[in-house]
Amino acid sequence: MKMFKSLRLLPHIVSPFQKCYSTDLISLVGVPRVKITKGQNRYLLVNIHTHGFTKYGRVIVRGADVDNHLAVFDSILEELEPEGICAKILGGGRILNEAENKKIKIYGTSRTFGGADHTRTRNILQAWTTYKDFKITVKQ
């Protein structure tokens, strides 16, 4: 009898793992966490998730040398929509990427999307292999 009670719990145990390893969620792993260009960038901190699975999201950083943050958002949508990935903007700012000096400065806010959590952005950049040796400063 105990075995039957244990078997009833099996769907509750397996379901979270099934969601984590479904093909829709695996596509999130294929999205690079950081894409910024050299020089001064406008950047956005973005929470991405597969439609219907908002609980299993991932935070990414995207930046480009463009006139406004809306242009960065448009490029994000062009990248993610074909994959069926939704994006929620957490905020924006500016990044000065001095690759030759191995320095990055994160500062400012976006007029369109509000300010991003620059400390969180710094942590994401430091976790990325390209920028782990960089000196990253945050100015609010």
From Swiss-Prot:
Q: Does the keyword Ribosomal protein apply?
A: no
Task: Write down the Pfam families for this protein, in alphabetical order.
Answer: Ocnus
What keywords would UniProt list here? Answer: Differentiation, Sexual differentiation
Q: List the disulfide bonds.
A: none
Give the Gene Ontology MF terms in alphabetical order. protein histidine phosphatase activity
What is the purpose of this protein? JanA and janB regulate somatic sex differentiation.
| Family annotation (InterPro entries) | Janus, Janus_sf
According to its UniProt entry, one GO biological process term is: cell differentiation
Q: Which residues bind substrate?
A: R42, S110, R111, T112
SUPFAM superfamilies per record: PHP14-like
Task: Name its species.
Answer: Drosophila melanogaster
Q: Which family does it belong to?
A: Belongs to the janus family.
State what protein this is by name: Sex-regulated protein janus-B
